[in-house]
Amino acid sequence: SAYPTARLEEIFEDNIFSKTSEITGVAGGELALSREFVYPIATYEETKWDASGALINAFSMVKNHEGMGLQLMFRPTDPIWTKVSSERTQNLKGGNKKSGSSGIAIVDIAKGLVRAPFEPPEAADKSKKQEKVLTADEQTKIQAIDEKAKYPGFEVLIRVVASSDSEARSEALIGGVVSAFSQFNSTSLNGFKYEMLKDKEKIARDFIFRLFPQNKNKNILNSVELASIYHLPNRGAIPTSQVERQTVKQVDGPVKIPKDG
């Protein structure tokens, strides 16, 4: 609905693996969250620029005999992730601190019973009302965690694979993509880290078959974060020379067409 003139077409699968290069020239890995998933990455609402331009620049470095692919796969996650976010904010506020020993807790209760007859009611009420004073950084984190939990969450797998004459060249191509993803890094919150995989045959197989393991619930992004990573290229933000665009548009036919006459 955000792109009413967009048209989807089914195409043949692109083969990014060079026919002349061997498996030794393949490199790849995954981009995972650098911190716990409750912390959000930097989105378009904060950066105010289109991050897809840097990704397109990274892919423009690929030569004719080389190949590189970026897979972004996601699926709805269990709504329980919002409870984890709520628990994290409570911990930051200091509301869920538990004693490390039941014996210490019993001693504290006994001390309270002994002091109670000699302690003025005002002093007791004052001690109960004492709350943790949050720092500016803690307030920012609490607000960011709550804001992320407002939107639907998705388990995400981001895989990048490159094929060239040598592994060093493939890693250099991947380095451009990793650098482009640094735009989503937030100093005090979250970002992405690149995890290189050593099994080259497994990298190629997982990429071809789009393998999405079940244990990827540590990488959870909401709909705003996903839209920041991938969206249809904006004509105003992305130069026309970098993206192949349609020269014609398909329009719907008239509703009432005469059947005779």
What are these regions (language model features)?
Residues 1-259:
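Extended, folded cores of ATP/NTP-driven motor/assembly subunits in large transport
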